[in-house]
Regions:
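Conserved active-site and cofactor/substrate-binding residues in soluble primary-metabolism enzymes
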Residues: 8, 26, 60, 81, ...
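Rossmann-fold NAD(P)-binding glycine/threonine-rich loop
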Residues: 70-89, 96-136
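General beta-strand structural signal in soluble alpha/beta enzymes
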Residues: 13, 64-67, 94-96, 119-123, ...
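Substrate-binding/catalytic subdomain of NAD(P)-dependent oxidoreductase enzymes
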Residues: 161, 172-269
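N-terminal glycine-/serine-/threonine-rich beta1-alpha1-beta2 phosphate-ribose binding loop
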Residues: 1-88
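Rossmann-like NAD(P)H-binding beta-loop-alpha module
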Residues: 113-181, 192-193
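ATP-dependent carboxylate/acyl-activation modules
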Residues: 259-310
């Protein structure tokens, strides 16, 4: 990223067991080695640091806070407190945690505006595939009238395997063995992950003021082999589709195999329909460590660019 004139100085990192802080800048290669060896960054310095995430945000000065804790769709914690505290301290925020946005997108945007900070979250939808940026920037000047897509790679992988002859239980086990399924499998199987991404898209792309309770959500637990066979006869495949066309819905639907949206495996795809440009489909990897890191770097560059304009 040096070619963009950006050399971030990381002054603090925390994980579930502790933290590492150095206001002059942490040595990132050493930090990674420590995490690999000990399972926590708290062993970075000779004196172990047990400072919590919220204490770090409150007491360590930084320009940007990057929030990467697990998504929680019950109360959005601890991510919600991390984000709001950072904003109140006039820190810009990058989040790949969907929970706070899914439950309180409108109020978080208002808080960012009030505190004159930049809030970026491109990694929450599509991982390394810039779905949010595409809709907001590449279709600038257009009015997007609706969109629909496959926003969860895990369920798409399971449904693809079912189309190849596996039972639901066998396909689920295979997905778990490959590490695709969330620790709380209901986030994938009941459509909650897709619903969270739908909320973020609806707010960001369509300027709707919605949260998770506004989504009519149905997962894939009740999809049977008969449903899969019936779809095949219709030259279709069953996919978990998140759609925004007046109503916000997540549900299994038959999609024609000739439709660009009908992707297989862990791929994500989304089709935006706009007033004058018709329908455009984006396909890409939905998640993964490197992909998520790529989205964070992209957001960091955007923040740098926006600050330079001020």
């Amino acid at each position: 990223y040096a070619k963009y004139g950006l050399k971030p100085r990381v002054v603090g990192v925390f994980d579930s067991k502790g933290s590492a802080v150095d206001t002059s800048g942490l040595e990132l290669e050493k930090l990674i080695e420590v995490k690999k060896k000990f399972g926590s960054v708290k062993n970075y310095a000779k004196t172990k640091n047990s400072m919590s995430g919220i204490d770090m945000i409150k007491n360590v000065d930084a320009d940007v806070v990057i929030e990467t804790t697990a998504s929680n769709y019950k109360d959005a914690e601890p991510g919600m407190t991390h984000i709001t505290t950072a904003m109140k301290r006039r820190m810009h925020v990058i989040s790949v945690n969907k929970g706070p946005l899914a439950l309180a997108f409108p109020s978080l945007m208002e808080l960012a505006t009030y505190n004159q900070v930049i809030f970026k979250f491109s990694g929450t939808v599509g991982g390394g595939t810039p779905i949010l940026d595409y809709a907001k920037n590449s279709l600038r000047g257009e009015r997007i009238t609706s969109f629909s897509g496959i926003l969860n790679g895990t369920t798409n992988y399971i449904l693809t395997n079912m189309a190849n002859g596996l039972s639901f239980d066998t396909a689920l086990k295979d997905a778990k063995d490959k590490g695709y399924v969330e620790a709380d499998e209901s986030l994938d199987l009941d459509g909650l992950d897709a619903a969270a991404k739908l909320v973020i898209l609806a707010n960001w792309v369509m300027d709707m003021k919605v949260t998770m309770p506004d989504i009519n959500c149905k997962g894939i637990r009740n999809v049977t082999t008969d449903d899969i066979k019936k779809a095949k006869k219709n030259n279709c495949a069953v996919k978990l589709i998140a759609s925004c066309n007046k109503e916000l819905i997540v549900e299994p639907k038959e999609v024609s195999v000739d439709d660009p949206l009908c992707v297989n495996g862990t791929l994500n795809a989304i089709a935006f329909t706009s007033e004058h440009s018709g329908t455009q489909t984006i396909i890409g990897k939905g998640a993964g460590g490197m992909e998520t890191a790529s989205s964070i770097l992209r957001d960091l560059l955007d923040i740098r660019q926006e600050i330079a304009k001020i």
